Each structure stands twice: as structure tokens, then as C-alpha cells.
Amino acid sequence: MQPKTFVHQLHAILLEPEVNKWIYWSPTDNTVFFLKPYDPNFSTHVLKRYFKHGNVNSFVRQLHMYGFHKLSHPSPDQSSANNGNVKELVEWKFTHPSGFFFKEANAGILNKIQRKSTGVGKDGKRKNILSPISVSYVDASRLNVLSQQSGPVSAREPSNMFMGSPVHYSTSQSPPHISIPQQQQSSGPYLISSLPPQQPTVNMMRRQSISARMMNSYDYPNQFSTQDSIVQPQQPQQVLSPQALSGPPMKKSGTLSSTDDLKTTSLPIVNYPMPYHPGAFAQQQQQQQQPLPTVPPYSSYSTPFPSMMNSLSNSASNSPALGVCNNNVTLPKKSNISERQALDNHIQTLKNSLSTITDLIEKHINSASQDENKTLTNDAMNKDLRTSLSLLQNSKEEIIQLESKWMSMQSVKTTALPLQETTNTSSTLTSLTSSIIPKSIPIITKGEVATKPASY
């Protein structure tokens, strides 16, 4: 059920005949209703009864929150009351501009009238809605660096930087006084002179150091060491001036014409700001001083890639899809072993199931034969059970025979020969080749060759 809002409650009050003396529909227009705000009975018999309060101003405020408009056309009673006759006869008339609030409106039509947004959430707290002109302060020295790099900027460009508004202030502070001199059009952005001075912080000094390194590392790559990027917070430093940050003029680099220029030229290294840590610099120096690991000579290895050869031999012996042929020795496929094991499991499961079913049926028949009071239907059931028992016994015997045949076939099969891990490429599978005995060849001496006749 949908909750009852202020609009539903107001519509129900207007339909009550007992309160029509103080609030009622207009007899000529079904979209207009009247109320007597200064009548004490309106506060007592209407507001306190339906809204649990007697504040007329709060009731009128709710009307405005839901979009009701007060009409300014006075009635005859109101004109006489304004003349000083009776104040309780003053009437106000309201209507809703959408036309959804009328005498015959139902709940579905009244649901279309929504309350205006007040900037307050459901928890009762006011939402923090920032205006588009709220901009935080920008470092003045950094803006000086940007202005020197980009050159003179027209007075129209700074207003486009911060959403088209020349007034910039933070929501947490009062807006500072901005004084714009007349010579700013030729000197650069006016935001630089209008920003309030700030105390140098660790982040500001780190940004200044990075800006100086980025500007000067192209011509002087070794001028700034890595120690400049780490700023000690205990030692306050002064804000660098634009002249100190700008450095010497940059020279345009031409095309490299010789190999010596390629050797002497080094690319700039820009260190981005990182969180300050006391032991970071010492750890970085230790890492730079550690020598690189040396590579042993090629002759120290027995094979060029011993680990690769071992992994290849192991993967060949464990290959599930293909057999490995090495020195006329064929290894069985691993997939056959898995299929054989699966078939053994299926046969064993079927054997156990049939044995259990046979035992249960036999037990049922033996218990049924001992009962004397059995009808003809029980005899027919016993006959079917005997037939099923005979079939299951035959199946059990066949499975036993199949299992015996399978075991005999397994005994004939040859087992897999494992591969040996080798560390020398010249000798592979020495244990397998040593077991192969070559045919004996007779040794003939020189004397036998001389006495043996030649056969042509």
C-alpha cells in the first residue's frame, strides 16, 4: 500500500462535510479550494485533528512545497474583512497549476503531484552542493612557470580556465579581495597577482624542484642529482623565484651528424613526486652500488640448456596423447591407462550393484515363501521375482567372466618404461640402450685371413 502524503490528506479533508465551514471546494471551480486561516476553529478542528499541530504558517508552507499557488482575487467576505469588520472571515483560495488536484481526482492522479526538492537528504542532513565557481587556490610560483613557458596570455584566457568565472575562492574560507591592475593584459594572467600568499610546504617545494628539473634536464641532464627530489621537512626552504626556476635559455637541438653525438647524448630522466620516506634514499643508493650478477661461461655447462632438456624429457614421458619413440623403444600411451582404469571402475561398480540386487530379491522371495496367507496376486509377483532373479544371476556370471578375461589381457600387456633424466646431449637414455645386446660378430685374425681362400 502506498504511503499517504500531504496531498492525499488534504484531498480527504476537503471531502469531509463537517469541516466545510473552514476549508471547502469552490462551488464554481472544482480545481480551487478555500480556507479561513484566521479562524480559530480552523486551527483547532482541522489542523490539530488531521496534522497533530495548529500552526497555520506550517500548513501554508507545505502547500507551497507541493506547488500550490495562492490566488490574489479577493472574495466579498475578504474585502469586507480587510476594511476592518471581521478578521475571521478572511478566505484564501489555492489551486495547483498542473491541474491534477481537483474534486474528483483519485489516488493515482494525486501521486503525480510531487514535493519540491529542498536539498535535504532522507537522513535529514543537508546535501553539500558546491557551486561551479568554488575553486581551490593554485600555487603562485607554479603559475609563474606556466606563464613563462606559454608566453603572454590574453585577459580572456584565465576566465576560461576555471569554468568561465573570474571570481575564485574556496568554500571553506571567505572570498579574498581581488584587485586587478590595469597593466595585466601585457604581463600575463591576473590570477597570479590576486592569489593570497601561502607558506611553503613540503608538497610545494617538491613541485618546484620537479618543475626545475623538467625545464633544465634537456640541456643539463647531470646537473640535478637524485638528492634534490627528497626534501627534508625539518628544514624550511624559501619559495624559488621565477628567474631561478627558468634557468639558462634552452638551445634548439639539431640533427645528430656523427656517432660521437649519439654516445654523448642522454635522455632526460624525470622523477615524479613520491611519498617522503627517511630510508628511501639510503635504500636506493645501496641498490645502485650492488654489482650486477655475472653470467658463467658457456663451457661451464654440460649442456647448453640443461633445465630445458630435463623438462623436455619429463614432458615426453608424461605425454598423454602421443607415444615417445627413442632408441627403438616405444612407450605406451597414457590415455590408454586412464581408459583402462575407468573401465575397471565401471565393471567393479556394476558387479557390486548386481550382487546387491540379487541378494535383496533372494531375501524377499525367501521371506515371502514362509508366509502362508498369500493371495493369487502374490503368487504372480513371486513368479516375476523369480524370473528377474534368474536374469540377474546370469548377468552376474557374465560380468565375472568378463572381468577374468580383462585381467588376463592386462597381464599380457607390457608396462611403461620410464625415461631417465640426462645432463649430456651426447648420451640419451643410457640405461635403455645398455640393456640391448648386439649380435656377436666373429673376430678374424691376420693369419686366418691369409689362410682363408678368397671367394668370388
UniProtKB/Swiss-Prot annotation:
Region (Disordered): 229-299
Gene3D superfamilies: Winged helix-like DNA-binding domain superfamily/Winged helix DNA-binding domain (1.10.10.10)
One of the GO BP terms on file: pseudohyphal growth
UniProt similarity note: Belongs to the HSF family.
Superkingdom assignment: Eukaryota
Name of this chain's protein: Protein MGA1
Annotated SMART domains: HSF (SM00415)
Cell inner membrane listed as a keyword: no
GO function terms (MF aspect): DNA-binding transcription factor activity; sequence-specific DNA binding
Gene Ontology terms: cellular component: chromatin; nucleus
Biased composition (Low complexity): 231-246, 253-267, 283-299
Subcellular location: Nucleus
UniProtKB keywords: DNA-binding, Nucleus
DNA-binding region extent: 3-118
Pfam families: HSF_DNA-bind
